[in-house]
Amino acid sequence: MKKPKGLLRIALATTALVVACGGEKADTKAPAAGAAPSTSAKGKDAITIAMIAKSSTNPVFLAARTGAEAAAKELSEKDNIKVTVNWLTPPEEDGQVQAQRIQQAVNDGADAILISCSDAGKVTGAINDAVDRGVAVMTFDSDAPQSKRFAYYGVDDNKTGQVTMAELARLMNGKGKVAILAGNQNAPNLQHRVQGAKDEAAKYPGITIAGVFNHVETPQDAAAEVVRVDNAYPDIQGWAMIGGWPLFTRALLTDAKFAKMKVVSVDAMPEELDYVAKGITPTLYAQSVYLWGDVGVRTIVDKLHFKKDVPKIIPMELVKVSKENLNAWAKQLKDWGFTNVDPKYLK
């Protein structure tokens, strides 16, 4: 697999940064999509992939779409095949709508489906039906492990929750009351992150959890929930955010109460960089969201065109982003096609 532009730069910049769980080093290397060499017999020369993310208003999934479309264009030119990505993501999170979009993709003649599941229980039946009708299904970000999907690409969600809480506990010197911001309560990946955060918090006698707070996954709704909780629980001293939703808006940059908190968040999108620079959120754990689409498309092409065997689980490693490597990460985002990276971080 071709390494996306800029990955070497950020990998070098983060060599010394260690994810605080199991001592694993964070990096941005995209894993090889196929473990076995391709056979001499080639498969499909025209592949249509229906991409169904959780929400078309969430910038992390727009980045994944960009990665998918870029990979499709590259592979089409390089390997003399026609790879098309059809974006079938609903405007808001809704597992039932996703199930309908899966059925739509099958009826439209898609060869494969690449999906991040809002609710595994609501899409597993539709995934299985698609596979039974000859459509290959791969999940990313949020899995449906009991389904007939052939592969999943994403972070270890339990570990993601653990490292987020461990870093927060470190910043708080192991004591204080914290809250967990958790997004969609039905999303299986977020459920695992919450459990990981809880398990990690239990290791610190001085850390207590005020609650787990779910919300609609838009920046505005997430920021409003943070403000509501801060007012309802004035003794909260820290936030473990298992997704970066409220930091996708600038609203909390001027919130005096929030500025006094210790905050650690998953994701590191362009909108979040100011929170790091100002010290409001000292640590972000980035998912290389562009690669959700890039690796997803390459894996599907490996399976359907090159007839490779691909692993059922393709791990993505988190990248620890702080002031020390903020500029390098900003340049990586720009290399991935983000147009809203503040120029001051690109110097």
Task: Give, region by region, the residue ranges found by the protein language model.
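A residue-level marker of the well-folded mature domains of exported/periplasmic proteins
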Residues: 2-3, 19-347
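Bacterial N-terminal signal peptides that target proteins for export
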Residues: 1-11
